[in-house]
């Protein structure tokens, strides 16, 4: 996640989010802070629906929605979306966002020149008319009391508010001013913008700061942001292969991929994995797999290396006091846990699952409610996505253990590589 946008209403979430999406960012709008976003999102837009709330409730909503995302490392870029006509709890929400993101400065540039919203000499103008003289002043839910933005902000914030006028923006002085304000402590900086180029200059000045300020604006400033601020590098991510089948076909496919240097393998001790003290084996497998995936290597979890492993099942059943069915179910369930743990710690580009029991167990561990089939990699080997799962719309290829030629696994890895470049 590269960027978090906190908006106070749904349509505002969307009109700002689309500025980033149209430049190629994977942008997701959440209607509630409790929702779980996609692992592949570049930009997360959270709607607090707080515009008409009492100021203290709005501040609490913003802080609660934003603070968990600012505890990660590296911290994402934070953008506080506000109404371009300054309706709502501007001061309270900006202050809460500064506290949650631990930013000393907030830069407010809510102009949208293409929509007739501009800022000149610290005042909000709508098609050239001061805000207080427009219909927005008498908004039934959130009326406006001033055209001067600093006055609106100061009504709900004790943080000092400064104004930077157009001439300073256009002569290139904004960056130095922001640095100077930061040296004085906390500050909210209201910046003039009349044309799109002014917003570009504001974005550039913000990027030049040693510590990125909280950006506060509407669709206009969002559109002016350079893409490297909110888009992750596109790269092919490794595939996690869970080879739980003991079939000869699956063994040949795994061996073929290893011989061709297409993947690395983590061998699983089935006896340890099904034991009552499997935690150590699970932790070891997860650690090894994550290390390989972090090196962008396709990684295979293998439960059977040799044909004679099949002959050991009866002995393992006797030792574990389980039937073949019980043993298979426990192994599948534990592999599901392993897969979930790996996915929580590593970035992957897709899943390849061999064996029906394994595929079912992994789907369950990931919380999938179904499987959406999209295409066929090879005869009887589909590619699709799990529905409402922990891995969103990452490709998942499933294969019955005995299906496929020796090259099927390599073909599947190539297929996923060509489909996705990851997040």
Swiss-Prot record:
This is D-threonate kinase. Its EC number is 2.7.1.219. SUPFAM superfamilies: YgbK-like. The keyword Transcription regulation does not apply. Keywords: ATP-binding, Carbohydrate metabolism, Kinase, Nucleotide-binding, Transferase. Signal peptide: none annotated. Substrate binds at residues 9, 51, 81-84. GO terms for molecular function: ATP binding; kinase activity. The gene is dtnK. Disruption phenotype: Deletion mutant is unable to use D-threonate as a carbon source. Catalyzes the ATP-dependent phosphorylation of D-threonate to D-threonate 4-phosphate. Can also phosphorylate 4-hydroxy-L-threonine, with lower efficiency. This side reaction may serve to deal with the toxicity of 4-hydroxy-L-threonine by converting it into 4-hydroxy-L-threonine 4-phosphate, a useful product that can be used by PdxA2. NCBIfam families: ThrnKinDtnkGamma. It catalyses: D-threonate + ATP = 4-O-phospho-D-threonate + ADP + H(+). Pfam families: NBD_C, SBD_N. The keyword Nucleotide-binding applies. Belongs to the four-carbon acid sugar kinase family. ATP binds at residues 245, 355-358, 401.
């Amino acid at each position: 996640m590269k960027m978090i946008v906190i908006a106070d209403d749904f349509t505002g979430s969307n009109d700002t989010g689309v500025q980033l999406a149209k430049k190629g960012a994977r942008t997701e709008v959440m209607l509630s802070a409790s929702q779980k976003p996609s692992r592949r999102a570049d930009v997360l837009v959270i709607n607090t629906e707080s515009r008409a709330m009492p100021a203290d409730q709005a501040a609490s909503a913003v802080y609660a929605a934003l603070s968990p995302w600012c505890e990660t490392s590296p911290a994402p870029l934070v953008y506080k979306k506000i109404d371009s006509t300054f309706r709502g709890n501007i001061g309270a929400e900006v202050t809460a966002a500064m506290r949650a993101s631990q930013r000393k400065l907030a830069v407010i540039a809510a102009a949208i020149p293409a929509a007739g919203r501009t800022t000149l000499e610290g005042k909000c103008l709508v098609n050239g008319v001061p805000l207080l003289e427009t219909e927005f002043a008498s908004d039934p839910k959130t009326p406006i009391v001033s055209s001067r933005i600093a006055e609106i902000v100061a009504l709900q914030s004790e943080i000092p508010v400064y104004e930077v006028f157009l001439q300073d923006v256009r002569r290139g002085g904004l960056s130095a001013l922001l640095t100077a304000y930061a040296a004085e402590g906390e500050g909210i900086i209201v910046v003039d913008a009349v044309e799109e180029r002014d917003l570009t200059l504001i974005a550039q000045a913000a990027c030049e700061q040693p510590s990125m300020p909280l950006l506060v604006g509407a669709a206009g400033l969002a559109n002016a942001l350079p893409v490297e601020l909110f888009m992750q590098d596109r790269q092919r991510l490794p595939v996690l292969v869970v080879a739980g089948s003991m079939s000869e076909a699956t063994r040949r496919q795994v061996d073929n991929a290893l011989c061709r240097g297409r993947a690395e393998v983590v061998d699983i001790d089935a006896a340890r994995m099904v034991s009552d003290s499997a935690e150590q084996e699970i932790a070891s497998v997860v650690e090894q797999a994550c290390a390989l995936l972090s090196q962008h290597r396709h990684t295979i979890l293998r439960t059977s290396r040799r044909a004679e492993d099949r002959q050991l099942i009866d002995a393992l059943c006797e030792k574990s006091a389980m039937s073949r069915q019980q043993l298979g179910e426990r192994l599948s369930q534990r592999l599901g846990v392993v897969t979930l743990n790996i996915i929580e710690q590593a970035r992957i580009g897709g899943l390849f699952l061999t064996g029906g029991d394994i595929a079912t167990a992994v789907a369950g561990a990931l919380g999938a409610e179904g499987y959406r089939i999209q295409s066929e990699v090879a005869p009887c080997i589909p590619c699709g996505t799990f529905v409402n799962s922990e891995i969103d719309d990452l490709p998942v290829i499933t294969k019955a253990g005995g299906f496929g030629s020796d090259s099927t696994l390599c073909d599947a890895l190539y297929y996923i590589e060509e489909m996705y470049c990851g997040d």
